[in-house]
Amino acid sequence: MFVDQVKIYVKAGNGGDGMVAFRREKFVPNGGPAGGDGGKGADVVFVVDEGLRTLVDFRFKRIFKAEHGEHGMSKSMHGRGAEDLVVKVPQGTIVKDIDTGEIIADLVAHGQRAVIAKAGRGGRGNKRFATPANPAPELSENGEPGQERNVQLELKVLADVGLVGFPSVGKSTLLSVVSAARPKIAAYHFTTIVPNLGMVDAGDGRSFVMADLPGLIEGASQGVGLGHQFLRHIERTRVIVHVIDMSGSEGRVPYEDYMAINNELEQYNLRLMERPQIIVANKMDMPDAEENLNEFKTKIAEDIPVFPISAVTKTGLRELLLAIADKLETTPEFPLNEILEQEDEDTVLYKYVADEPDFEISREPDGTFVLSGAKIERLFTMTNFERDASISRFARQLRAMGVDEALRKRGAKDGDIVRLLDYEFEFMD
């Protein structure tokens, strides 16, 4: 089954804790601090693997947690850093942050790497805090927590060729006879509801990937039917093969179908009309097909080639496949960052944003003061509260940031409860 969107959770490794230790050896008086630093945690890294074609593996594993760094040790030995957690994804994967909607990475080239969740650095051991005024400090840092994210992976099919057309014009049948793909084929509309991929051999040593995409209907560019799902898949297709039922067996007019499909492509994304398009007149083994083809040719430009075929009887296929292979050789790829030139909801618009304040103060109905903010929360989680010296250092950091004064201005008095993350303490004026 083809899966083109999936939501997963990623958690980078925490940094290892720093250690409080002292050098105690015979004949070495006043050995001094010897606590090592914690090791760096592991990043969560996505790497493009050209051998993967779908996101189906993520249906069975949706939680990815990287390893933590080792804690610091005595004798000034640092903890070992953890190895990055490498997650392989197919070409064309877009990674979005679910909470912010930001595009984190657009992975299109084999071997391309992107850090999706950054690891925390290791906490410093007490050797790092030695000063002339305090040569034997009894404080250390905890490791920094690793970043965690809920992300959505979106795969835009990286097929060389995309088959487009109204439902039941023979796209799935065509793919099944020119490749080893076995799409579902039936005599009703929307038999194909997800893309089917097939490797096609042109017969002269050249090959390409062809995608049988779900059928379009009028209004698809506004999301009617399978509209946006279909059009999302065709954005990176290099060559569009427009399949038309030339027999008109369903009471449709071939030229009107041709114009309607092109209109939907243009309405969705004007750049799609720049794709080379090959017109395929299918079902030429049916009555009235030849007459309809002649009429169709009179309504389009003379320099637009039309390839009459019958996917059922397999006539005209070799000429079509060679023409597609020739067209691919002269057609570049269309990366997403070139396609989305116009600003839309997926565009990353870079603008100046003021730095986030070090902390914010709010108050709950019961009178509790709540501290929040990335910087103050980071300082808190990296403080070793088992050591009095570390607690004193944290208090000095809060004072230097202006937290005490800000609480007083908000009306805090002796004994009031102040909450930071899941911990509470009393305010002392």
Swiss-Prot record:
Q: Which UniProt keywords apply?
A: Cytoplasm, GTP-binding, Hydrolase, Magnesium, Metal-binding, Nucleotide-binding
In Gene Ontology terms, what is one molecular function of this protein?
magnesium ion binding
Which InterPro entries does this entry report, sorted A to Z? G_OBG, GTP-bd, GTP-bd_Obg/CgtA, GTP-bd_prot_GTP1/OBG_C_sf, GTP1-OBG_CS, GTP1_OBG_dom, GTP1_OBG_dom_sf, OBG_GTPase
Q: Which organism is it from?
A: Listeria monocytogenes serotype 4a (strain HCC23)
Subunit annotation: Monomer.
One biological process term from GO is: ribosome biogenesis
Q: Which residues bind GTP?
A: 165-172, 190-194, 212-215, 282-285, 310-312
Q: What is its EC number?
A: 3.6.5.-
PANTHER family found in the cross-reference section:
DEVELOPMENTALLY REGULATED GTP-BINDING PROTEIN-RELATED, MITOCHONDRIAL RIBOSOME-ASSOCIATED GTPASE 2
Q: Where is this region: Disordered?
A: 124-145
Q: Where is the OCT domain?
A: 351-429
| Cofactors that this protein relies on | Mg(2+)
Query: Could you tell me where this protein is found in the cell?
Result: Cytoplasm
Q: Has UniProt tagged this entry with the keyword Amino-acid biosynthesis?
A: no
Domain OBG-type G, which positions?
159-329
Positions that bind Mg(2+): 172, 192
Principal location class: cytoplasm
Tell whether Metal-binding is among the UniProt keywords: yes
Per the entry, what this protein does is: An essential GTPase which binds GTP, GDP and possibly (p)ppGpp with moderate affinity, with high nucleotide exchange rates and a fairly low GTP hydrolysis rate. Plays a role in control of the cell cycle, stress response, ribosome biogenesis and in those bacteria that undergo differentiation, in morphogenesis control.
Q: What is this protein called?
A: GTPase Obg
Tell me what gene encodes this. Answer: obg
Q: What is the lineage of its organism?
A: Bacteria, Bacillati, Bacillota, Bacilli, Bacillales
